[in-house]
Amino acid sequence: MSIFTSFLLLCVVTVVYAETLTEGVQNSCPVVTCSSPGLNGFPGKDGRDGAKGEKGEPGQGLRGLQGPPGKVGPTGPPGNPGLKGAVGPKGDRGDRAEFDTSEIDSEIAALRSELRALRNWVLFSLSEKVGKKYFVSSVKKMSLDRVKALCSEFQGSVATPRNAEENSAIQKVAKDIAYLGITDVRVEGSFEDLTGNRVRYTNWNDGEPNNTGDGEDCVVILGNGKWNDVPCSDSFLAICEFSD
C-alpha cells in the first residue's frame, strides 16, 4: 500500500469517528479535520506578577533632581544643655532708685546724740579735761606703736601736752609712767609730735634727754610730770587725747 493510499484511509476513519460522536453530544467542539494550519489568535491576557526580585545595582545614568521636602516629622527629645556663652557687653546705667531716707537719717542723728552723751559721761568720769581736750588713760602697758593703734581705733591720738596745764592733766590721769606722742625718730635730738610738727613746750627731767644706748627715741611722762627719753619698744601706759 502506498503512502498516499494510507493517508486517505486515515482521513475516512477520522470522519466516521467524528460523526459517531456528534450523534450523542449537542454543542460539542468542531470535528477535527485534516486541513492546513489556521491563523494565529489574538495575544492572551497578561499573567499574574511574579515574585519580587532582588534589588538591582545602581544605574549608570545621571542622578535625578532632588524631590520636594517631605512632611515635618514629630518633635524629638530635648537635647543636652549647651556650653555657657560669653559674657555680654555691659548694659546702660539704670535710673537711680528713689528712696526716702529721712526716717533713717533721723534715727542716725538720734543714735549719734546718744553716743555723744555716753562718750561725754565716760570722759567726765574717767578723764581729765583741759579746754576742749580730754585725756584718758589705759590700764594696760604697751609699746608706742600699740598705743598709737589703740588711740586711733577710738578716733583719738597719743596724748601730747602743748602747755603746763595739759601736762598736769596728763600727769593726774596717768598716775604712773606713760607714753607721750613725742619722738626724735627722724632727726636725733629734734623732738616732734606724731604729725611731724616740732614741739615747743617741753618739761624734761634733769639730765634728759640723754639717748642712753643710742636707742631712746620716744618720750614718757613720769609720776612727777617730768619727761624722759626711752626706747619705743618698752611698755608703758597709754594716754589718749580726744577733742570735744
UniProtKB/Swiss-Prot annotation:
Composition skew (Basic and acidic residues), residue ranges: 45-57, 90-99
Domain called C-type lectin: residue spans: 129-241
Recorded coiled-coil stretches: 108-126
Region (Disordered): 40-101
4-hydroxyproline carried by residues: 43, 58, 69, 78, 81
Keyword vocabulary terms for this entry: Calcium, Coiled coil, Collagen, Complement activation lectin pathway, Complement pathway, Disulfide bond, Glycoprotein, Hydroxylation, Immunity, Innate immunity, Lectin, Mannose-binding, Repeat, Secreted, Signal
Residues covered by the Collagen-like domain: 38-96
Gene3D superfamilies linked: Mannose-Binding Protein A, subunit A
Disulfide bonds: 151-240, 218-232
Any one Gene Ontology cellular component term annotated for this protein: extracellular space
PROSITE patterns registered for this protein in UniProt: C_TYPE_LECTIN_1 (PS00615), C_TYPE_LECTIN_2 (PS50041)
Signal peptide segment: 1-18
Compositional bias segments (type: Low complexity): 65-74
Alphabetized GO MF terms: calcium ion binding; calcium-dependent protein binding; D-mannose binding; galactose binding; identical protein binding; phosphatidylinositol-4-phosphate binding; protease binding; signaling receptor binding
Keyword Repeat: yes
Localization annotation: Secreted
One example of a Gene Ontology biological process annotation: positive regulation of complement activation
Post-translational modification: Hydroxylation on proline residues within the sequence motif, GXPG, is most likely to be 4-hydroxy as this fits the requirement for 4-hydroxylation in vertebrates.
InterPro entries: C-type_lectin-like, C-type_lectin-like/link_sf, C-type_lectin_CS, Ca-dependent_lectin, Collagen, CTDL_fold
Primary location class: secreted
Glycosylated residues, chain numbering: 210
Annotated PANTHER family: MANNOSE-BINDING PROTEIN C, PULMONARY SURFACTANT-ASSOCIATED PROTEIN A
Domain notes: The coiled-coil domain mediates trimerization.
Subunit structure: Oligomeric complex of 3 or more homotrimers. Interacts with MASP1 and MASP2. Interacts with MEP1A and MEP1B and may inhibit their catalytic activity.
Protein's job: Calcium-dependent lectin involved in innate immune defense. Binds mannose, fucose and N-acetylglucosamine on different microorganisms and activates the lectin complement pathway. Binds to late apoptotic cells, as well as to apoptotic blebs and to necrotic cells, but not to early apoptotic cells, facilitating their uptake by macrophages.
Protein name: Mannose-binding protein C
Native source organism of the sequence: Mus musculus (Mouse)
Underlying gene: Mbl2
